[in-house]
């Protein structure tokens, strides 16, 4: 199997990526709380793929540091990558329609009618 190397590992362990905002967490603007909260259903889905032996990836449009912070807060072990199209990623879960992996799933966004844009503070 060492001759096959990476090909065997890719078949055996697919790469599955999860976005942070509105996928692994629900932003405070959608909950009415003063803080972001874990999205229990999507975290359970993450753990299911993890239990199957997949290579788990967490990424965010907010950057790698933001993704790393949330991975640590949520207790999720994953590879942290820049959020961009990546031929290595087999499956991607995101709240937006994306083309970042071989197969892309759009998860349900809570209270979609509420804008996710941050309000600009005027000083």
Model regions and ranges:
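HAD-like aspartate-dependent phosphatase fold
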Residues: 1-123
């Amino acid at each position: 199997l060492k001759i096959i190397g990476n090909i065997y590992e890719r078949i055996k362990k697919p790469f599955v990526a999860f976005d942070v905002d509105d996928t692994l967490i629900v932003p405070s603007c959608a909950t009415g709380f003063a803080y972001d909260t874990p999205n229990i259903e999507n975290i359970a889905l993450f753990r299911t793929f993890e239990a199957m032996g997949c290579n788990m990836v967490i990424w965010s449009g907010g950057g790698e540091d933001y993704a790393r912070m949330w991975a640590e807060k949520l207790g999720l072990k994953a590879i942290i990558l820049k959020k961009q199209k990546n031929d290595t990623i087999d499956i991607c879960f995101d709240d937006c329609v994306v083309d970042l992996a071989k197969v892309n799933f759009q998860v349900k966004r809570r209270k979609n009618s509420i804008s996710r844009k941050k309000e600009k503070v005027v000083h």
